[in-house]
């Protein structure tokens, strides 16, 4: 059930019940387990544009966090007989274990077109009533759908205590590894893995970390992770980052971390019409005159007239990033 009144019927996937969230679409053909467990999807109902999901199953190694953060899951067809030597369970079982309500068998191409043309919008998945046969229940649910908003997202997904990780490779004998402070705004496990594989010692910090707490660690660099929600909502985090940038510690932001860094430096952000979510997003570096295919997951962008370095080459989507 979409906020604009459109109703799409399908078959229950995962748990029974009703869930409300912001409906978005992701264009990846693979990586569905990473998508589901990515904290950046907090509060959202994910639509997979690729028609068959779950064909290589789910496993305990590919999770980007300890749970599913999305509010719901929409697929054209969920595979019930996955085939892969690493597979441990089906998509349906994984959703049920995490208490997630999903739906399959709907026209995901049609839904994606709606979101592309109208922009992402709120919606609901329900197994509790037929909205066409019971209009009074639909009328009661619609105000809840329309009023839904993703708020307090960073506070919900960040860690509560610092966590330390040792390098797994890349450190010569007798050398001290670089120490990276990683501000957890909704951090994916793979960011930590990539840093450790490159010889870094990583300290993951809560989003509320202050300048004094950062200085006490004396890191060689600061990384700000991905994360969910409206970047402008995180007023205190932005103020803390501004103080951190003034120290001269080399800093690098990914996704929400990039947006918060931009806000701390005086730039502005905006909500995109339907965002970039998938592993096939083109980005042009005008200085190098090269286009790269990138993996992205964000619904907000830094306004180009305040801080432009890279932009999408697509004439239909000139969102700055």
Tell where the protein language model's regions lie, with residue ranges.
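Active-site environment of divalent metal-dependent phosphoester hydrolases
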Residues: 189, 301-303
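Cysteine-nucleophile active-site neighborhood
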Residues: 216, 220-221, 225-301
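Conserved small/polar residues in nucleotide/adenosyl-binding loops
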Residues: 310-315
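Flexible loop residues that form catalytic
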Residues: 78, 227, 316
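Glycine-rich active-site loop/lid that clamps phosphate-bearing ligands
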Residues: 304-309
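RNA-binding accessory domains that recognize and position tRNA/RNA substrates
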Residues: 1-179, 185-200, 205-208, 212, ...
